[in-house]
């Protein structure tokens, strides 16, 4: 009898331990790696710029990063919602990072969909340093960076994700 009770208690202890470890891992805020910060992007004018310099440009401001592409139907469906967020959050910098297949397609998509904000082209593509180190598995992808340069929302894949508005209101 006591062996059965001890076995049950041990199972409970192990289950609690697994839960604690899982929650502590998930609770850790993710930050951009050195590899991601050093990835080279292109400006609308075609100049090369490293990602850390882009973040430094907007330090002291809240940044909403939208990783998207003109060929991505979910990205395009989300644009009206992103535009609503822009209207509600005039003090937020909207940084659009494109994964279009070519610079020409990227430039066309900006004009076609009338996207206002700061635009950069991820020349290294989906498998480049930036995308691979942020665990990019779907676009659109939204990341929010606080005025101190820390990621406060690591992953949202819909512009109407309630966490986006909640985080923006809190900053």
Model-derived segments and spans:
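Short pre-active-site segment immediately N-terminal to redox-active cysteine/selenocysteine motifs
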Residues: 61-63, 67-71, 138
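Thiol/disulfide oxidoreductase modules built on the thioredoxin-like
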Residues: 115, 122-169
């Amino acid at each position: 009898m006591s062996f059965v009770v001890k076995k049950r208690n041990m199972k409970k202890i192990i289950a609690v331990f697994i839960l604690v470890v899982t929650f502590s891992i998930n609770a850790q805020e993710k930050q951009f790696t050195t590899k991601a910060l050093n990835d080279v992007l292109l400006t609308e004018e075609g100049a090369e710029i490293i990602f850390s310099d882009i973040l430094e440009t907007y330090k002291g401001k809240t940044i909403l990063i939208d990783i998207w592409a003109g060929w991505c139907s979910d990205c395009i469906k989300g644009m009206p919602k992103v535009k609503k967020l822009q209207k509600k959050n005039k003090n937020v910098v909207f940084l659009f990072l494109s994964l279009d297949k070519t610079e020409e397609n990227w430039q066309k998509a900006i004009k076609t969909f009338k996207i206002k904000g700061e635009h950069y082209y991820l020349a290294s593509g989906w498998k480049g340093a930036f995308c691979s180190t942020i665990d990019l598995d779907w676009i659109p992808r939204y990341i929010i960076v606080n005025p101190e340069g820390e990621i406060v929302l690591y992953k949202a894949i819909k512009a109407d994700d309630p966490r986006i508005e909640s985080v923006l209101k809190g900053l």
